[in-house]
Structure formats: C-alpha cells, structure tokens
C-alpha cells in the first residue's frame, strides 16, 4: 500500500511539473534516475559498465522538459500576439517581466486556476456543464485582459518614468560638470536601481559597447531605436549631439527645462477640463441616479430596505467604479 501511495505522489508531482505549477523535488528526480537505471536491460553480449553517477541531479530534468504544457502554450501565445498588439521585450522588462514567454506562462497558470475553480464551483452546485462553460469564459476573460494589462500599466507608468528621467538628468549634469566622462556616468547609473528604466537602458548601452563591439554613439543609436518612450528618444538625441559636439551638460540642462515646462503647460491646460469632467461625472453618475432611485423607491412603497439597497448600489458599486475611471483619466491627463 505504501508503494502505491508513493507512485501516486510521484505521478502528481510529475503532472504539476508538466503544468508548470511547481518544480520537481530532489527526491522525485532521484527516483526518476533510479527507475531509469532499472529499465536499462543488458543483452547477453553487452559488456557491463558501471553507470555514470551525476553529481548534479538537475541534469535529469530533460526527461520531463519536453512535456511542459504551460511552457509550450505560453510560447504559442507569445508568437500569436507578439507585435503591435503586445509591448516589446524591453517594455516588459521595464515592468519586471523577463520576456513574453515568461509573461504568458503566468497568464496560462492563472487561466488554469480560474477554469478549475469555476469548474469546482459548478460541481458543488450539481451543474458540471455550467461550471465547465463558466470556466472556459473565465479563462477567456483572463486571456483578453492579459493582452491589455501591460499597455495599460505602461501608460500609467509614464509619470514615474518621467520622474526617473528628471532625476537622472540632474545627476548627469552635476557629474559631467565635475569632470566625469559620459561612459563613466552611464556606468554609474547602471549600478543604481534608483534610476529605474534609465538604469536598465544604461546597462543595455554598456552591454552593446563591451560585448557587441559598438562604439558609444552606435550604442546610443541602437538604444534610441529600441525604446518606444518619446522622452528617452529625446535624451538619446541630446547625448549623441553632446558627445559628438561637446557641451553635453548644457544640452541636458535645456532638456530638463523643456520637460518641466511641458509638464507645467499640460497641467495648466488640463485643470479646466478635469474640473468640468469631475462635476459632470459625479453629478450625472451619482447625484442624479441617487435622486431618481430614492424617488422611485418612495413612490413604489419599498420602504427603508429599498432606500438601503439604493445607497448600497451607489456608494459601494457605482461610486468606487466611477472614482477609479476618473482617477485614471486624471492621471493620464496630468502625465
């Protein structure tokens, strides 16, 4: 009986590994190694040789690697949606994601969890078919949302990127005026996480110079072609011109002033629009529906419970949703 349970546990571990949910444990890998040895049958004319002992158990992971369902599915999804519909690899790295396959691997795992959860809920309600349909719909919603999530996050991330670039410009101007060269400044920025996206870009530029064999101007041109952030393109333009012609601190100072001035102008021009939209949104979205529902409740003689239901709907559902949408709009307009 103990052997049956051990085999069942091993099969469950292998299934979870194939689904990409958890890695194989050292014990399971050792068991796979031993079972593989047992299956090797010697012919009578073979010369017996002691099997090679691997110190690193992880070398046996190739036995099951080909069956990684989640990995293959994620790879297929990344090939389908890669391009204009989906952010570039660099933009994903800004978000802390290694690449498209790693992102879609997480998406597939969430889809599987959602499907199984809704299927289980349908099973509890004695309606397996409805649970299966709900699971498919839920997994589909997760997939659709996953396509738009990175771009929405990058749009909301614009203001933080602008602040990171402004702090980087202040640092670069002060260090360059102190006598440091541009390669030394980029090396220093790449070692500090405080500069966020700019630190990542500086690492890419240094890698192009040290490993790719490009000179600094060519590496800056490549970085300019890779990025989709307009402010970074302006920064690279100024760095290229300043490195070739000289007086880089002055050019970076002008860029800093332009970014701040543009942000202030945008903020001033958006004040009137944000104020009017706020009055319209909360007036039409909250006050008018609240008044109408209260009147209909009183006319329909629904009593105090009807008034509480109306307040619950407006304050706990419509209100927070409206506030979230308005907050996103304000953030986009300001940044």
Swiss-Prot record:
Residue stretches spanning the membrane: 104-124, 128-148, 280-300, 310-330
Which residues, by range, are in coiled-coil regions? none
Q: What is this protein called?
A: Uncharacterized protein MJ0780
Tell me where in or outside the cell this protein is found: Cell membrane
Q: Where does the signal sequence lie? A: none
One GO cellular component term of this record is: plasma membrane
Keyword Cell membrane tagged: yes
- UniProt xrefs under Pfam families: T2SSF
- Bilayer disposition of the protein: Multi-pass membrane protein
Q: Provide the species name.
A: Methanocaldococcus jannaschii (strain ATCC 43067 / DSM 2661 / JAL-1 / JCM 10045 / NBRC 100440) (Methanococcus jannaschii)
Q: What's in the keyword line of the UniProt record?
A: Cell membrane, Membrane, Transmembrane, Transmembrane helix
Q: Does the keyword RNA-binding apply?
A: no
């Amino acid at each position: 009986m103990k052997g049956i349970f051990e085999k069942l546990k091993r099969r469950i571990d292998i299934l979870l590994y194939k689904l990409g949910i958890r890695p194989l444990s050292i014990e399971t890998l050792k068991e796979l190694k031993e079972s593989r040895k047992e299956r090797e049958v010697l012919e009578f004319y073979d010369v017996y040789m002691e099997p090679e002992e691997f110190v690193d158990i992880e070398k046996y992971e190739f036995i099951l690697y080909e069956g990684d369902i989640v990995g293959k599915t994620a790879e297929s999804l990344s090939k389908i949606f890669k391009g204009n519909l989906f952010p570039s690899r660099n933009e994903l790295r800004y978000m802390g994601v290694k690449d498209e396959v790693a992102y879609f691997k997480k998406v597939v795992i969430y889809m599987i969890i959602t499907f199984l959860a809704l299927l289980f809920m349908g099973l509890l309600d004695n309606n397996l078919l409805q649970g299966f349909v709900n699971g498919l719909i839920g997994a589909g919603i997760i997939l659709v949302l996953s396509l738009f999530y990175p771009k929405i996050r990058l749009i909301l991330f614009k203001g933080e990127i602008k602040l990171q670039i402004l702090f980087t410009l202040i640092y670069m101007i002060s260090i360059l005026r102190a006598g440091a060269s541009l390669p030394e400044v980029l090396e220093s920025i790449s070692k500090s996480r405080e500069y966020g996206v700019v630190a990542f870009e500086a690492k890419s530029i240094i890698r192009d110079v040290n490993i790719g064999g490009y000179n600094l101007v060519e590496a800056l041109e490549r970085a300019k072609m890779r990025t989709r952030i307009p402010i970074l393109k302006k920064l690279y333009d100024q760095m290229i011109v300043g490195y070739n012609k000289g007086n880089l601190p002055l050019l970076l100072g002008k860029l800093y002033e332009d970014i701040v001035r543009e942000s202030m102008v945008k903020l001033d021009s958006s004040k009137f629009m944000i104020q009017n939209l706020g009055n319209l949104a909360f007036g039409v979205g909250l006050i008018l529906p609240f008044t109408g529902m209260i009147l209909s409740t009183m006319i329909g003689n629904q009593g105090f419970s009807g008034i509480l239901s109306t307040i619950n709907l407006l304050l706990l559902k419509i209100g927070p949703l409206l506030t979230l949408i308005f907050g996103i709009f304000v953030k986009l307009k300001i940044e």
